[in-house]
Every structure is written in C-alpha cells, then in structure tokens.
Amino acid sequence: MEFSQKLYQAAKPIINDIYEDDFIQKMLSGDIGADALRHYLKADAAYLKEFTNLYALLIPKMNSMNDVKFLVEQIEFMVEGEVLAHDILAQIVGESYEEIIKTKVWPPSGDHYIKHMYFQAHSRENAIYTIAAMAPCPYIYAELAKRSQSDHKLNREKDTAKWFDFYSTEMDDIINVFEAIMNKLAESMSDKELEQVKQVFLESCIHERRFFNMAMTLEQWEFGGKVND
C-alpha cells in the first residue's frame, strides 16, 4: 500500500465524524443558517490567503519543474477558481462574497490550523511535512463531496448541493499531485520519520473538523471569558 493510502486509511474515522457533524449535515439538507455561512466564508477567506502563501513556500522545496509549474497553477486556482464555491454560499446568504469578507474574522480554530501548517513549512526542509499538513484540506473536501453524491439526504432542491458538486471534482488534480510527491519522498524515509508525517497529516484532519464546527458555533476569541448574568 502506498504511503498516501495509509494516511487516508488512518484518517477515515475523522472524516466520518466530520460528515456526521452539524455543518455537513445542515449543508446536505440545505437548512444551514446564514450566520454560519457568513462566519465560514469570512474565516475561509483568511485561511485560503495563507494557504496560497504556503504554496509559495513549497516551491523552493520542489525538485521537479513540473511540480513547480503545478503549484503556480494552484496559486491561481486558490485566487480565482475556488471563489466559485464561495459564491454559491454567498448567494444562499443573499449577499455578495466580496461584501461578506470585508469584515475579517480570525477565529481560534483557523488560527491554530494555519500555524500548524506554517510550522511544518518553516521548521522542516523536507517538503513532505508541509504537504502532509496541507493535503487534508483538498482531500477531505473531495471525500465529503463525493460521499454526498450518493447520499439520499443531499437535497437537490437546495443550492447547497452545488457546493458539494463543485468539490466532488475540482480537488482531484491537487490531490493526485500531493499523493505523487508524498509517495516519492516517503520512499527514502525511515519508519519513525513516516510516523511523524502521519501525525502531521492527522493533526490537520482534526483541524479541518474544528474549522467546520467553528462556523456552526460562530467561534470567536473570548479574551475576557464568558459573562454569566
């Protein structure tokens, strides 16, 4: 079994939990609230900006010009292509995407996730660690979306179905490239090192779950604690 497949197998329980959590279930039914969608879009805009910067940090670590070219193309996709998925949700809210993200949010779950990825990029020379931190994002979105396509709970009468349709196909290229790079780099690594990479991957899967849940709870920093009247 290739290394990437071992990672996916280990991540299955987490992905199952994400699918059953409120965010995805409400998206499937089309009953998700506008406040949750706004919070998600604002947080995801901040997240994707940093995710794009991480692609730029990966480029110097690449040995293949084909990989460099693909990462440059992915930067363009993050800036332009994925906005299509955001526009779907913004239309459901009834506001333009640009208007929604004018108000920035940086919730704890997004903060911790981004810092986890940056730590790998800056502290590890081997690109496999950075990729292992980044790869769960496209992989989990694709897995959730593909699973939705055969789920009777997917409400085709609601526009949220279009969001699942988008991610059911649009992540395949980056998933394949990340897989190929990780599998190649894994060949020359020890079992102990690969266990560390696996840990990085699974931590990002947990961060993905917390990110979705963040939207449902309208998570924010509570520096003064909660006040109980």
Swiss-Prot record:
GO biological process: thiamine biosynthetic process; thiamine diphosphate biosynthetic process
Taxonomy, superkingdom: Bacteria
Disulfide bridge map: none
Site entry: Increases nucleophilicity of active site Cys: 47
An example Gene Ontology molecular-function term: thiaminase activity
Keyword Hydrolase: yes
One GO CC term, this protein: cytosol
Entry binding sites for substrate: 44, 141, 167
Keyword set, alphabetical order: Hydrolase, Thiamine biosynthesis
EC number(s) on file: 3.5.99.2
Entries under InterPro entries matching the protein: Haem_Oase-like_multi-hlx, Thiaminase-2/PQQC, Thiaminase_II, Thiamine_Salvage_TenA
Pathway as given in its UniProt record: Cofactor biosynthesis; thiamine diphosphate biosynthesis
Catalytic activity: 4-amino-5-aminomethyl-2-methylpyrimidine + H2O = 4-amino-5-hydroxymethyl-2-methylpyrimidine + NH4(+); thiamine + H2O = 5-(2-hydroxyethyl)-4-methylthiazole + 4-amino-5-hydroxymethyl-2-methylpyrimidine + H(+)
Active site: 137 (nucleophile), 208 (proton donor)
Subunit structure: Homotetramer.
Sequence similarity: Belongs to the TenA family.
Cited NCBIfam families: salvage_TenA (TIGR04306)
Function of the protein: Catalyzes an amino-pyrimidine hydrolysis reaction at the C5' of the pyrimidine moiety of thiamine compounds, a reaction that is part of a thiamine salvage pathway. Thus, catalyzes the conversion of 4-amino-5-aminomethyl-2-methylpyrimidine to 4-amino-5-hydroxymethyl-2-methylpyrimidine (HMP). Is also able to catalyze the hydrolytic cleavage of thiamine; however, this thiaminase activity may not be physiologically relevant. Therefore, is probably involved in the regeneration of the thiamine pyrimidine from thiamine degraded products present in the environment, rather than in thiamine degradation.
Protein name: Aminopyrimidine aminohydrolase
